[in-house]
Amino acid sequence: MKRTNVKKVFSAIAVAGLLAGTVAAAPVAVAAPEFTPAPIAWGSCNSPNLRKAGAECGFLEVPLDYGNPGGAKISLAVSRVRHTTTRSQGVMLVNPGGPGGSGLGLSVLGKAVPKHAGESYDWIGFDPRGVGSSKPALSCDPGYFGYNRPAYVPDTPRLEQTWLARSKSYATACAKNGPLLEHMKTTDSAQDMESLRKALGQQQINYYGFSYGTYLGQVYSTLYPQRVRRMVLDSNVDPRKVWYKANLDQDLAFDRNIKIYFDWVAKYDSVYHLGSSGDAVEDLWYTEQKELAHAPAGGVIGPDEWNDIFLQAGYYRFGWEDMAKAFSGWVHGGDWKPLKALYDDADSPGDDNNFAVYNAVQCTDTQWPANWTKWRIDNWAVYHRAPFETWSNAWYNTPCLSWPAKAGKPVTIDGRKVAGALLIDEELDAATPFGGSLQVRTLYPASSLIAEPGGTTHADSLSGDACVDDQVADYLATGKLPARKPGNGPDAICAPLPDPVPAQS
């Protein structure tokens, strides 16, 4: 996953982060000594949004290394919004994806579930190890995503070497985080979830995962299948492809989706005046990108920032208007400030926590190719088919070439013992291509898949599509899934939310 704007995914419910509180817990690891958790000491949250929602906050203390539970400890930031019904359906843990996304504010997510179905759960938001308000939080080089960086496409040997040096420098800087880097695998976070279950005094958990959070759910439910009561996985990672192949697949999908976006911009040429066909808009976009390499907009928005801004159009429909306005404002009026605002919103210059955790997890979940020649050959081959995102995505992952922590082996995902799961995906999702959801459906025989043909939005459940959200509500309320159909296709179909219509049209 690359630069998912978690803030945008949940903007409809205005979640946010810090907390106040204290204390402890931690538990059993898979094939590791037992660690008995203590209850979390709940207190007041620092976040106004969490306080307004009636949330409590605290810290969960867990082993740095579950193989040595008596050793060093780290603390996970946790929030809770309690059930308001007479009968509780237990706890619902939520992860927004990333890896590296903060989930602390997501204890308010239950309020977005229709039919009051979320009210019978205790919703648990948490920052995974190394993330956000958890302690310690990873950071390697806060200025890594500063403005006007070297161009992504390495069309000269010098540019290629510049990016390889930048990536190696970042990985080297990450070594200062010490032993935490050796314990940032998805399996570590799955064990943290098991610690959280025990600290909350629950025999089972319910789980809601988005994007990378689906993979965390897959790993947890493979390691602890009897501990899963109900599970919703929205936009599924294909566990066969973690993580090198998954990123190459993303490149092809994002190129398809940006063309869909350019077609939409052209449809409203009377509003934006950027071209009357998708091809014309695309040509103009690449022309502007080349010119920004020589004269960055406002001195800050160069070709990389330009790419990063519009990457969000491949993730979600609901930012399309703002991006088109900024595109048009720059082309026709030289107004660069809306571009900078969009970039800052997605990438938060001066804060590399998300990126540090992203690499710490993905670089150690599995072994990446150690030979740069393979990366070069594979990425150039994909670039010639899909130029929009390929080299940006490649450089986002190249710290894995020299990551200062050992890689492990990915878990073989097996959902045969899991009681049930609701899978959701839009069929043109670029960040987690739809084949991943089909594969997970195969691996979880008791699951059902809701598909949205033609939809391009990533992680879109509980965002206002009544067809999807009502089925989520029914599952959470009763445990009933859409009837599973023969074969390996979707079990239920919903229309995606319609494309936005510009106000001026």
Identify what each model region corresponds to.
Residues 237-255, 324-327, 335-348:
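Flexible "cap/lid" loop of the alpha/beta hydrolase fold
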Residues 330-343, 348-349, 383-391, 497-501:
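Short, mixed-charge aromatic SLiMs
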Residues 1-31, 60, 193:
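Secretory targeting and sorting signals
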Residues 332-366, 370-374:
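Long, low-complexity segments enriched in small/aliphatic residues
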Residues 32-305, 360-362, 366-505:
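Gly/Pro-rich cap/lid or specificity-loop segments adjacent to the active site
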Residues 158, 317, 326-337, 345, ...:
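Short loop/turn hinge sites at secondary-structure boundaries
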Residues 314-328, 332, 368-373:
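Short helix-capping/linker segments at secondary-structure and domain boundaries
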Residues 293-309, 315-319, 348-356:
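Structural motif
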